[in-house]
Amino acid sequence: MAVSMACARPLISVYSEKGETSGKNVTMPAVFKAPIRPDIVNFVHTNLRKNNRQPYAVSKLAGHQTSAESWGTGRAVARIPRVRGGGTHRSGQGAFGNMCRGGRMFAPTKTWRRWHRRVNTTQKRYAVCSALAASALPALIMSKGHRIEEIPEVPLVVEDKVESYKKTKEAVLLLKKLKAWNDIKKVYASQRMRAGKGKMRNRRRIQRRGPCVIYNENNGIIKAFRNIPGITLLNVSKLNLLRLAPGGHVGRFCIWTESAFRKLDDLYGTWRKSAKLKADYNLPMHKMTNTDLTRILKSQEIQRALRAPNKKVKRRELKKNPLKNLRIMMRLNPYAKTARRHAILQQLENIKAKEKKPDDGKPKAKKPLDAKTKMIKLAKAKKRQARAEAKTAEAKTAESK
């Protein structure tokens, strides 16, 4: 597959109706090198899609076609208006409110809503340029799901003879010769019934998108291709973003006729000259002409403008408690170590003095006993007395014998 060389070659081959190169080459238009901006494409696509909407609204009378009156307070029910009368389930039910069954909706829709959106012409052209540039990158085309594994080249350009086709069988044969029929097979395989209520609104079936055929003059090409499912036909002078980027996503597979491909430089111009067919229009410029950021930053021009790097590292100071950390306390109070050492020595001297204190013969004052200790001592004394009396009684008994 030759698609890996896309956008790298300055010349694009023109293919004949037999799927072979015709020997002619076309210069790659500058629009295919325009910046690809998916954000702009998505924004413009969203706003253009809104211009196809049809105004709708609910009836002004909806929810109010009944006689209902509030019962007021004092009935232990909500003050919502209630249907009058009796003899039916409807009587007494709430009415009018958006919380009621059969009531009107909240903020009923009106036909004078702001349906349409205005988009800047330059912004629309920027989006089309981005979509065209993306259609020349095989990776983006394949990411959209197009089957282009076997096609000879991207972008794919065919001879102008194709514009005079009038029969669908000729168009089918051309697609098969160009190896693009796999993309049509994908469309056939994707045809299915729509989910939801669109089935009731003339939108029963849905299918995937196929190739987009872009021509310069309609000499019968529309009749030849229009009945093939998935095919979209566009005039190169009236390129539509809704067709080039379906769903707001870039990467549509495009098949160009030779004259349409050559006309792109006149339509969008190059960076050296403005467009001939659009007044005062120039191609959007890239924000970066060189994508090698490392090379740009290390260039002499950038380095000369930059100041020298500041290598001074400022570390965060760790705060410590001087009452717990002696080293920090000594920094604040150099005498702290001496005072602490003096206190320790004084404590040792007091301990030694207590140990060496002589006994002067005076009876030491006894500590007063608490009630519990007194009871224990009294119980022990009674036990000793009982034991002594028992021994005395035994001794007397032995003597009498």
From Swiss-Prot:
Component of the large ribosomal subunit. The ribosome is a large ribonucleoprotein complex responsible for the synthesis of proteins in the cell. The gene is rpl4-b. One of its GO terms (biological process) is translation. Component of the large ribosomal subunit. GO terms for cellular component: cytosolic large ribosomal subunit. This is Large ribosomal subunit protein uL4B. Keywords: Cytoplasm, Ribonucleoprotein, Ribosomal protein. PROSITE patterns: RIBOSOMAL_L1E (PS00939). It comes from Xenopus laevis. Residues 374-385 have a biased composition (Basic residues).
